[in-house]
């Protein structure tokens, strides 16, 4: 009996060694290109998906195990903190019995969460991962049967192509090939049917696991929130019982470090109710008092700015009258003979005139108020010539020119060009431009000086420069006044 068993075991071992040798030989021939390897693209794709699914499943299972371990650690830490709090809480303090119930419920809640997490999440993932090993073994077996099938096929082809035919060897080769083909095709077909089903089952597994985790978290956090509110109420009762006790951190005998008073915690109503309670804050100074007192100051400041602007313009006009003595008389008389700044037909301003007006505005803002008044300025020679020519044109034209000066144009019209020697005019957008009109310098001087026109013309002739510029200025003033009469007739 013992000899028979030993012989059978030896025969089985020899048979296995022969298979391993035959498979190794076939693989070497396939790598060298001596034989053709059978391939199935459909199975290879399914096998690739399986290996990817296996790697993802093992990674998720490992992370869930770490998550459960962390929950256990948190459970133990929370339990120790609760037990220590119960030990230090004196029995004569308010809420001693309530604290004992809170600590017990806290421990039970952690235990329930830990057990259900292990049962509904970790065990489900464990069952899902456990089937990978079986499928992996079947895929490896299918690979071995594929090598046997290729080896039997190549052996049959070699026997059939031999020069010397042997019917016994041919029959034996055909029988071995048929067996290897049946075994391989059956196993291959089973895997082709099972692998896609297993690959699609991963979706249902993930849904089940994470639905269970989310539900367990929801229940756990909701119940834990209730326990936290109960604990906060117990501590609030203790605070009311000993309201005269203040938590102070002393400086530990350090001269540079002061004692600190710990602020009270945040109210618990912020978590339970949508509107958080209003905590007492330090009174804030109302902003209405400074604004009420600042209104008169702003009004007075605005008035001072307007006064300084008017004084600056007057002083600018006196400075310009001094500069006119050296400027060109033709340009000064032409610009002075124009109507008011807001006249109906202003000429387009040239770039040079605009630059000059900007420079005059800058100089007027820089001048200090009160340096000179317009009504008291001494008229320049150009102004005297202008007054003489204006009086000789007739009373009717002077009345129409005065009426034109009194009219105000809409604020959208630009100001007329001004030469460097003419009087200053208020801009349309300035506060003074809407209420006051720009007038030639001759109007205040003509009203205050009662001398006749002939005497003033002689004085102007005596103080003016050469005769040629005076003739040109007289001609230009006459043309300008005639054009104004033609426009209003």
UniProtKB/Swiss-Prot annotation:
Keywords: Cell junction, Cell membrane, Cell projection, Cytoplasm, Membrane, Phosphoprotein. InterPro entries: AH/BAR_dom_sf (IPR027267), Amphiphysin (IPR003005), BAR_dom (IPR004148), Bin2_C (IPR048886). GO terms for cellular component: anchoring junction; cell cortex; cell projection; phagocytic cup; podosome. The keyword Membrane applies. It is a peripheral membrane protein. Residues 28-244 form the BAR domain. It is found in: Cytoplasm; Cell projection, Podosome membrane; Cytoplasm, Cell cortex; Cell projection, Phagocytic cup. Transmembrane segments: none annotated. One of its GO terms (biological process) is podosome assembly. Residues 267-302, 358-368 have a biased composition (Low complexity). The keyword S-adenosyl-L-methionine does not apply. Residues 267-489 are annotated as: Disordered. One of its GO terms (molecular function) is phospholipid binding. It holds the Pfam family Bin2_C. The modification Phosphoserine is found at residues 273, 357, 380, 392, 420, 422, 424, 430, 435, 439, 443. It comes from the Eukaryota. Residues 311-331 have a biased composition (Acidic residues). Its main location: cytoplasm. Homodimer. Interacts with BIN1. Interacts with ARHGEF6 (via SH3 domain), ARHGEF7 (via SH3 domain), SH3GL1, SH3GL2 and SH3GL3. Identified in a complex with ARHGEF6 and GIT2. Promotes cell motility and migration, probably via its interaction with the cell membrane and with podosome proteins that mediate interaction with the cytoskeleton. Modulates membrane curvature and mediates membrane tubulation. Inhibits phagocytosis. Plays a role in podosome formation. The BAR domain mediates dimerization and interaction with membranes enriched in phosphatidylinositides. This is Bridging integrator 2. It comes from Mus musculus. The gene is Bin2.
